[in-house]
């Protein structure tokens, strides 16, 4: 099983990509314009002691804590690759990618192939993975109870499932 955490998920949503996805999914032009207005009308300022910067536009992300933010995030990650051998369980920006087989080498091969596909998709959609919160776990049903679970770090930046024992 792979546990993948998307880095700054709500802050990094690529606006043009989200709007493009909404168009491909058949959202009405009127709704897309409303969402565009919602996303583009945000700005920020920086205060250092008594000095306040001029307003700057926020060019990516969706407002956290809003009702619409999680729904827009779900739309944005719609289309994450799926295969017959590999399954996904997602909650917000956390994803569990899992498979099962009696042979560990099949599991590792399927997950490795999936990681390569996922890496391309993540790059295309400008999504980064938080490597420090992502891991690989292999449960061997034939092993003794004390040695069934192994946790490894994964590297989606290289597209490799790094299994270091």
What feature does the model see in each segment?
Residues 54, 70-99:
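Active-site palm subdomain of RNA-directed nucleic acid polymerases
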Residues 1-63, 99:
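Conserved pre-catalytic core of RNA-dependent polymerases
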Residues 39, 77, 115:
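Short amphipathic alpha-helical/adjacent loop interface patches that line ligand
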Residues 5, 22, 35, 46, ...:
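Mobile genetic element proteins and their domesticated derivatives, centered on retroelements
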Residues 4-6, 94, 101, 141:
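Residues immediately flanking
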Residues 16-21, 106, 145-146, 152-153:
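Short secondary-structure boundary/capping segments
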Residues 101-111:
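Short helix/loop segment flanking the catalytic signature motif in cyclic-nucleotide metabolism enzymes
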Residues 50, 113, 129-164:
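Short, conserved micro-motifs composed of acidic
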């Amino acid at each position: 099983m792979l546990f993948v955490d998307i880095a700054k998920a709500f802050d990094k949503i690529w606006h043009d990509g989200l709007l493009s996805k909404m168009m491909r999914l058949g959202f009405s032009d009127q709704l897309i314009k409303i969402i565009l207005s919602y996303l583009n009308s945000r700005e920020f300022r920086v205060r250092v002691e008594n000095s306040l910067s001029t307003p700057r536009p926020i060019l990516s992300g969706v407002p956290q804590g809003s009702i619409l933010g999680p729904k827009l995030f779900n739309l944005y990650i719609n289309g994450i690759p799926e295969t017959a051998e590999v399954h996904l369980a997602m909650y917000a920006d956390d994803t569990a990618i899992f498979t099962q087989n009696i042979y560990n080498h099949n599991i590792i091969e399927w997950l490795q192939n999936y990681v390569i596909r996922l890496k391309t998709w993540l790059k295309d959609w400008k999504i980064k993975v938080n490597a420090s919160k992502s891991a690989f776990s292999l449960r061997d049903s034939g092993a003794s109870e004390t040695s069934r679970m192994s946790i490894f770090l994964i590297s989606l930046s290289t597209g490799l499932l790094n299994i270091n024992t």
